[in-house]
């Protein structure tokens, strides 16, 4: 009888310990932050920026006609960076797959998302939709490995013009036709411009998403090059207010290019979900500072990048 009682008490101890662990994990109300390494366009740069603490990377995709051909930015670019690093797009995607596929020798558990900055400004109107179709085909074949143990990271498609919503429609249609509509759960969207003559209003951006057939998985970016003055962050604050409103359509907001400690702290204080930076180690340092480590943490794969975390 005593042995039986001891076994029962022992089992309850294990259960309670497990419950305490679960509660502790759920009780972590710190804002998860995506640490986006800026302008990672050569495969040799991938481990370098991951080693600096990035949990996400951004690459620039340039086109020949409607075909995504290179990861390349070109001049001018952020101060202190090599603007002409590049790789063939298919090779870059295959390499990303290696770093984000469990079991691969290069796998990095902390690498959870990448942003494709799609340079569609060079495209004619009739090339926009085919470009979206071609990017979907490249991702399906070279990153997702046609659905057979491909990379697990989330993908954000960043378009520089709200008028290019047909890109998204073409992208989605390819995955549906190929029988991989499920992969759209891994895809988010960011309409970031155009910048000239002025940035579109949030209402205009929302309308573009409706035309693209997108409801959810929405990221919004705001910022300037790292050599520009900080300014008052008026648009950023407006976007965060919209995100946190009852009828907000934005899920995540990131700010670029944030390289200074002071600007990093300011962006976090305002309420961003992500910071795009040339120095991921700066954000890591700030996240470990008093006043920040209790309110923010580096996002992990278990954090849903399409979930809205209000301020």
UniProtKB/Swiss-Prot annotation:
Binding site for Mg(2+): 58, 60, 117
Active site (record annotation): 38, 73 (nucleophile)
Protein name: Dermonecrotic toxin
Protein's organism: Loxosceles laeta
Lipid metabolism keyword on record: yes
Family statement drawn from the similarity comment of this UniProt entry: Belongs to the arthropod phospholipase D family. Class I subfamily.
Disulfide feature: 77-83
Protein task: Dermonecrotic toxins cleave the phosphodiester linkage between the phosphate and headgroup of certain phospholipids (sphingolipid and lysolipid substrates), forming an alcohol (often choline) and a cyclic phosphate. This toxin acts on sphingomyelin (SM). It may also act on ceramide phosphoethanolamine (CPE), lysophosphatidylcholine (LPC) and lysophosphatidylethanolamine (LPE), but not on lysophosphatidylserine (LPS), and lysophosphatidylglycerol (LPG). It acts by transphosphatidylation, releasing exclusively cyclic phosphate products as second products. Shows complement-dependent hemolysis.
Catalytic activity entry: an N-(acyl)-sphingosylphosphocholine = an N-(acyl)-sphingosyl-1,3-cyclic phosphate + choline; an N-(acyl)-sphingosylphosphoethanolamine = an N-(acyl)-sphingosyl-1,3-cyclic phosphate + ethanolamine; a 1-acyl-sn-glycero-3-phosphocholine = a 1-acyl-sn-glycero-2,3-cyclic phosphate + choline; a 1-acyl-sn-glycero-3-phosphoethanolamine = a 1-acyl-sn-glycero-2,3-cyclic phosphate + ethanolamine
Keyword terms of this UniProt record: Cytolysis, Dermonecrotic toxin, Disulfide bond, Hemolysis, Lipid degradation, Lipid metabolism, Lyase, Magnesium, Metal-binding, Secreted, Signal, Toxin, Zymogen
Enzyme class per UniProt: lyase
Signal sequence segment: 1-21
Propeptide residues per the UniProt entry: 22-26
Notes on how activity is controlled: Catalytic activity and hemolysis are inhibited by divalent ion chelators (1,10-phenanthroline, EDTA, and EGTA).
One cellular-component annotation, GO: extracellular region
